């Protein structure tokens, strides 16, 4: 949005500033064991669900595949939402699917209850290249046991859910919001498990736009 790229091409949002990054939305690459797919490098010629056309998931899929030298011309592209991709994977109509969401993800858990699901890793060198080009990505590990029959950790990348404001927000208001947010994490954690990943220590991870001065002041306090 700040740079006017991807789904914001021609619709750049001026004056965006960050308040904080919150929890990771993991780019999960899902296939079934019977597909034989073990790496993104195996995608050539395969039917790949990349998310709904123009969605954030689709941008993630394209960017990750490009890190492996794979373009849309190399695969059979399927523009499917989370639910559609899950159904297509179960029915054998796609070979792999990208799902960008906090994990564990219900749609993937649903597939895993009746199928041998495999999470395709993002290799460390590819993740590094991706982060260098797109600094809003962060590295992440999907721990063993997150999904049924997942017996090993899987390396992945994530985009951080971000609170963004405009430069019209004054410093004092931004400071107050940040203080209220991080001063009430216990209440947030009791309301939703995703809040367990929110911390002051990681609030600037994956921050790809200028941080509001008021938020900066709060995070710099001891």
Kindly label every feature range from the protein language model.
Residues 1-44, 49-52:
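Short, glycine-/small- and polar/acidic-enriched structural segments
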Residues 13-16, 24-26, 45, 72, ...:
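Extracytoplasmic
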Residues 16-22, 76, 109-155:
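Short beta-strand->loop
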Residues 66-80, 93-96, 114:
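A local structural motif
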Residues 80, 84, 90-91, 101-119, ...:
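An extracytoplasmic/periplasmic, membrane-proximal ligand-sensing/linker region
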